[in-house]
Amino acid sequence: MAATDVRPKITMACQVCKHRNYITRKNRRNDPDRLELKKFCPNCGKHTEHRETR
């Protein structure tokens, strides 16, 4: 049942340094595409684009 979970856990990776900084949950029905958010990257020391990784 966990494989077809509506709200799976996803990891967010920085697009600049490629570090996986955040783990969050998303609703697959509302957001079927990959999630892209601007978040703070502690490795870069600034706000950068973070994208969902698989």
Curated annotation (Swiss-Prot):
UniProt keyword annotation of Ubl conjugation present: no
Keyword set, alphabetical order: Ribonucleoprotein, Ribosomal protein
GO annotations of cellular component type: cytoplasm; ribonucleoprotein complex; ribosome
GO molecular function: structural constituent of ribosome
SUPFAM superfamilies linked: Zn-binding ribosomal proteins
The UniProt record lists the keyword Chloroplast: no
Pfam families in the record: Ribosomal_L33 (PF00471)
GO BP, sorted A to Z: translation
Family listed: Belongs to the bacterial ribosomal protein bL33 family.
Name of the protein: Large ribosomal subunit protein bL33
